[in-house]
Amino acid sequence: MQFTDVHIIDAQSPMRFEFLGNINGSAFRPHESMGTHGGAQLVSRVNSLKKGPFSNRPFDCVVTTGDNTDNCEHIELEWFLKMMSGGTITANTGDPTSWEGVQTSGDRTYYNVDNSIGDNFKARGFPHIDDFFDHVIAPHTSPGLDVPWYCVFGNHDDQMSGTLPLWWTDLNKVFTGTMKFTGFLYDTNNQALARALNNGSSSLANISARTMNRSGSTVTADARRLPLHDQGVHGCAS
């Protein structure tokens, strides 16, 4: 059995690029806050199947072929391991009592799922769901796979958004801080960032942290967002 691109995500992380969603569609996904919940249901479904539909052969193992995390954060890996091996997951970072992601910002660019504001997604038929994020951040349980599992390393397990190198420390510092990254002061720098995300350009190397836009929102800092390489982690356990 194969899993791939599970992308367990800390959707409240300040080190994300949702504001580039009109350039890169994967920069914001309306369902991303439910990643661990969906993953736990995937595990339950595999456990219920037990064997292949054509061969009727019992599963020997599950192999997940990369991009187990979305943004190479330690907390994303922790949630992924609990999803695969079993355990209680609280899919929340920062403020322990509320959601601090873009979906509660009131910005019509994003899916404001549980408030009354109209947005681009609701205009296309996405529903309003009361108390959605209260349910998202409530503890839930994954049963863990009934068979052994193994995982392969992916680019999202090693780089910011699977594209930008962690050695670019100006952005690296944003992970565990309070400033929500919303781009740079100069449009040329934002264009360079978009190129880096879309085609792996290294043109960000000469951009200084002093040019970051610091007028955006703030979030509650969380040390668990530290990138994996800064924790000495260079892969994931099986």
Model region roles, listed by residue range:
Residues M1-M84, A91-S116:
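N-terminal active-site segment of His-dependent metallophosphoesterases
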